[in-house]
A protein has these predicted regions:
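Charged, often Cys/His-bearing segments associated with DNA-binding zinc-finger transcription factors
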Residues: 1-47
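Trp/Phe/Arg-rich N-terminal binding region typifying the photolyase-homology
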Residues: 56-70, 81-131
Length: 382
C-alpha cells in the first residue's frame, strides 16, 4: 500500500532505515530513554491497557497508522504536552522523540496531514473506556514502586470543563440564534414565507447591551423578558412548521437533542425569572450535562465540570467516584477505604481527609476497624 509506506512501526524499520549512519537512530533511542519523556513512557503498561480496553488491530481494510498501544500513548502524549490536536500532529511530524513515544516513524517527505485523526482516536478510546478496570491495571503495575500502601488520603475536586463563564443572557441568546437559524433554513427548504417575529430587534438590543461596560439590573431584566418571550414564540413557530410540513423535513439526532435542551432552558429561565430555584440547571447548550459545582473557595465560589472524589496513594491519585452532578463526598469515605484495599490488597490503617469526612458514621467505622484518622476530636478538650 503506497500510503502506508509513509508511516511505519519502529520494529519494521531496521533493514530500510533512511539514515546514512545506523548509529544515529541508536543515539536517538538512547537519548529518548534518558529523557523525561522516555521515563514517562516506561511507567505505563500500554499493551495491558489496550487489551483491557478491547483495542485491537483491524484484520480487514487499510492498516491503522497507530497500533492499539500507540493510540493510548498518543493520548498520554497529548495530556503531557497540552497541545491542541493540530499542534500535536505538527510536533509529531517533526519530533523523533514523540514518534518513538508512539512506536512510529514518519517519513519526512510524507508527514501526517490529517490532524482529525487525534479526535477520532480520542472518541474511540472514550467509547471503550472503563475507569475502574483501567485503574486496576495501573495500580497492579505501579504497586511495586509505591510506599505507604496502608495510608489512604481522600479529597474531592472538580475537573473543570473549558467553557466560557455562563450567564442567563448568553444561554438565551445561543438558544435564540440556533433556533432562528434553523427556522430560516426550514423555510428555504420548503419554499415558504418566513414567519414574522422580533428577532432582529432583540438582536440589536442584545448587541447594544453587550457593548455597555455597566449594565443596569433594570435593563438586564427588561432584555431578559424580551428574550424569553421571543424564544417561546420561536418554539411555537417551529412547532407550527413541523405540524404542517414535518413529513417533508429530515431531522438529525443532534437536532432533536439540541431542540429538547432548548425547551428545558426555556422552562428553567421562566422559573428563575419569577424568582424560583431550579435544580439541575443547564449552563451550556453544547455541554448540557455540565452542572454548576459549588466549591466555596475564595477565588472561585462555583466551578463548572465533573466533581470527582479521589483517593491518593503515595502521591498517585485514583478516581473513586465521578459525576457531573454535585454530591456529598463525606458519605463516601468507606468506599474510598474499600477501593484502596481492593487495588493494593493491603489493609488500610491510616486515613487523612478534610473535616467534611469527619461525620459520626465515618468515625464509628474507623474506630471499629482500628483505623487512625486525622479528624479533629469532637467536643471540648478536658
Amino acid at each position: 500500500n503506497k500510503d502506508m509506506a509513509k508511516v511505519q512501526n519502529i520494529s519494521e524499520i531496521h533493514p530500510t532505515l533512511g539514515f546514512t549512519e545506523f548509529d544515529i537512530i541508536e543515539k536517538y533511542r538512547k537519548s529518548f530513554h534518558e529523557s523525561e519523556l522516555g521515563r514517562l513512557h516506561s511507567v505505563f503498561p500500554f499493551e495491558r491497557m489496550a487489551k483491557t480496553m478491547g483495542l485491537s488491530e483491524q484484520r480487514l481494510g487499510r492498516r491503522n497508522i497507530f497500533s492499539p498501544s500507540a493510540k493510548i500513548a498518543l493520548m498520554v502524549l497529548k495530556a503531557y504536552t497540552g497541545f491542541s490536536d493540530r499542534q500535536l500532529v505538527e510536533h509529531l511530524n517533526g519530533n523523533i522523540h514523540y514518534q518513538m513515544f508512539c512506536w512510529i516513524m514518519i517519513n519526512p517527505s510524507f508527514p501526517i496531514t490529517n490532524y482529525k485523526i487525534v479526535s477520532a482516536i480520542r472518541n474511540e478510546i472514550a467509547s471503550r473506556l472503563d475507569v475502574d478496570s483501567l485503574q486496576e491495571v495501573l495500580a497492579s503495575h505501579w504497586k511495586p514502586y509505591l510506599d505507604s500502601l496502608h495510608v489512604c488520603m481522600a479529597d474531592a475536586t472538580c475537573y473543570e470543563s473549558h467553557m466560557r463563564y455562563p450567564t442567563d443572557m448568553k444561554l438565551l441568546w445561543e438558544s435564540l440564534e440556533w433556533l432562528y437559524r434553523y427556522i430560516c433554513r426550514h423555510c428555504v427548504e420548503l419554499g415558504i414565507r418566513r414567519p414574522r417575529n422580533k428577532y432582529r430587534n432583540v438582536a440589536e438590543s442584545y448587541l447594544s447591551y453587550c457593548k455597555k461596560r455597566k449594565r443596569k439590573a433594570s435593563r438586564t431584566r427588561m432584555l431578559k423578558r424580551r428574550m424569553i418571550r421571543l424564544l417561546e414564540k420561536l418554539l411555537i413557530q417551529r412547532d407550527e412548521i413541523h405540524r404542517e410540513y414535518g413529513t417533508l423535513l429530515r431531522y438529525t439526532q443532534d437536532y432533536q437533542k439540541r431542540l429538547s435542551i432548548i425547551r428545558k432552558v426555556l422552562v428553567q429561565e421562566k422559573e428563575m425569572f419569577v424568582g424560583k430555584k431550579v435544580r439541575d440547571r443547564i449552563v451550556s447548550i453544547d455541554r448540557h450535562y455540565v452542572r454548576p459545582i459549588v466549591r466555596g473557595k475564595e477565588t472561585k465560589s462555583v466551578e463548572f465540570g465533573a466533581k470527582v472524589n479521589n483517593i491518593q496513594i503515595d502521591g498517585i491519585s485514583f478516581i473513586e467516584h465521578l459525576s457531573f452532578k454535585a454530591f456529598n463526598e463525606g458519605i463516601r469515605l468507606k468506599d474510598c477505604i474499600r477501593m484502596q484495599q481492593k487495588l493494593m490488597n493491603v489493609r488500610v490503617r491510616c486515613v487523612a481527609a478534610d473535616s467534611i469526612y469527619a461525620n459520626n458514621a465515618n468515625r464509628k467505622f474507623c474506630t471499629k476497624y482500628g483505623i487512625s484518622t486525622s479528624f479533629v476530636r469532637k467536643g471540648r478538650a478536658a
